[in-house]
Design a protein with these regions (language model features):
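Hydrophobic alpha-helical bundle signature of multipass membrane enzymes
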Residues: 2-135, 141-168
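Membrane-embedded catalytic cores of phosphoryl/pyrophosphoryl-handling enzymes
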Residues: 2-10, 25, 128-231
Length: 231
């Protein structure tokens, strides 16, 4: 079990390193003025080819844009859970460690998004309402892949009913697949921008899950030691 958890942490770090390398490659490999208004696009040959293959589908873009509210609502629900624990237990230190870590995890993802909004790597392949918008990493894809796995993870931890857990698992898989594929074929992002979101969000989630499980293990070990001391 310990070996599996260690490999999970390593996988998370590797994915974050891959995201950093991917970002550098996009800035320096096959850069062409292939975007709207002549904006520079990295790995342009592949990006332009895939964009022409899928075309632009604004209906899919609009649907996935509105469905982006779902993970936001889920974040708010976890926030309410943490606040309820804080009010009831009257100390931040008594809030469940996995919820505190979840809040920190969401903050890190938000900061990453804001950073790339301020320092654009790629712009969208189309203008939105006549304006250029940053596209890397895809914000909606990042939001979905950051939040939805945590819904399944928290459900597995907190819900005893296996039917409800299974229903949540199916919902998470179907919703996530629809959103990622939808953004991919909608034509509002370059394919490299979707790939960047997948790598970043996956790496962050694996590290979050490792840390949450590690806190649980330490807590269990501490309780066992205290119990042995009492005996």
């Amino acid at each position: 079990m310990k070996e599996i958890r260690r490999k999970e942490l390593q996988a998370g770090i590797v994915l974050l390193a891959a995201f950093a390398l991917w970002t550098v490659l996009i800035r320096h490999i096959d850069v062409q003025n292939a975007g709207p208004n002549g904006t520079e696009i990295g790995i342009a040959t592949i990006n332009v080819w895939f964009h022409r293959l899928t075309g632009v589908h604004m209906l899919i873009y609009t649907i996935t844009d509105w469905l982006g509210l779902v993970p936001i609502i889920i974040c708010m629900c976890f926030g309410v859970l943490g606040l309820a624990q804080l009010i009831k237990r009257r100390s931040l230190l008594t809030v469940d460690s996995d919820i505190l870590l979840l809040g920190a995890y969401y903050v890190v993802a938000i900061l990453g998004y804001l950073l790339f909004e301020m320092v654009p790597i790629n712009y969208r392949p189309i203008l939105i309402d006549g304006n250029l918008e940053a596209s890397y990493p895809s914000s909606t894809t990042l939001l979905v892949l950051t939040v939805m796995p945590t819904l399944k993870y928290q459900a597995d931890r907190r819900i005893a009913n296996p039917v409800i857990r299974e229903a949540i698992t199916v919902f998470v898989i179907v919703f996530t697949a629809f959103m990622v594929i939808g953004r991919l074929i909608s034509g509002v992002h370059w394919v490299t921008d979707i790939a960047g979101s997948v790598s970043l969000s996956s790496g962050l989630f694996l590290i979050y899950r490792y840390m949450a499980d590690d806190f649980d293990l330490k807590k269990t070990t501490l309780k066992a030691e205290e119990s042995d001391g009492v005996q």
